[in-house]
Amino acid sequence: MPRRKKSETTNEGTTVVVDEKLEVDNSIGPTLYQRDENGLLKNVQYIFNDDGSVNWRAMIKEEHLFPNKGWFESRGKDCPKSTEGLEDHQLLIKLGGIKELAKLRGFSSVCYETVKCEKDHVAVSCAINFSPNYETNAEPILFEDMANATFNNTSSFATKFLETIACNRAFVRAVRNFLNVHIVGDDEIDKSNASNMTTEQSISVGPTSILK
């Protein structure tokens, strides 16, 4: 059991240090963080579609969403300061929001495989073992998706971390595609500058068609 140091002053005016036992109760977390027979967290209120499936899009907190500045700029429009009234294709979701969705859904493992690794082009696949729930007839589901990061679709700073960018993009894509979330991840979009593009064109599997 952990101990806390406690100072006491005696009648003689000297100070002694006494070990004091701390009462520790770690039962609160495990008690709250449990899943029911349907595979849903007991301490979370889920939102459902008309067919009874979980509306994972509705489970995303507003703090994880922000306007897609590039979408508005490409159309000569001012980017709004809030997400109010915006459609899903006008939004981006932060990596933290995707991680929270994955946590709410439940998973047992995440596995990355490097498909291609070159100086200017890294492609990675991400396979996630999603935990059983009532939506999958109590069966675990393995879902896999992939993404790439190149000099042509990352910022000048991010070109130093192509492997990390590719892994994040693949993870984001796997989670949101499995959960049927059509908001593009902030990590997925092309953040390159025209001046930083290489002359050699790379094949991109980015969500360009979704952003249009």
Task: Label each region the model flagged.
Residues 2-212:
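Polyanion-binding surfaces on beta-sheet-dominated domains and ring/shell assemblies
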